Amino acid sequence: MASNCWESATLWAEKANKIAPTLVGGSKKHGGPDLGPVRARNAWLILGVDGRGVANEPPLLEFNGVPRLTVRMLARLQGFSDDWTFGLRKTAAYRMIGNAFPPPVAKAIGEKLKECLLYAEESNGPGERLSQEIIWR
């Protein structure tokens, strides 16, 4: 929010410092990207975010009102690094981000699976059948 020197960014950040609603990829049945149905948009509003759409740019210096998030901001919320690219079209990019499984969660699951497989191989020997008990230990 502060990248364009928005003078209210610090105050906004204090209000927005809570868990955000789930991002959803949107529907092709209606217009461009928004942050979900009415209940979700109301939850975003409590955080100080206008959920009726996605901004092209962060708020400017003297912006007055409730800001919208950009595609990059939404990607950060979902756990994507800043070097991740989504293409140029805002709606398509938002759908990819909203429908994505968050990368940090995918990484944690992958690491746990690897740990289970390595443990199973050490315990049972290579190629032996795995027990579900290994996963839930």
Identify the meaning behind each predicted range.
Residues 1-137:
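C-terminal target-recognition/interaction regions appended to catalytic cores
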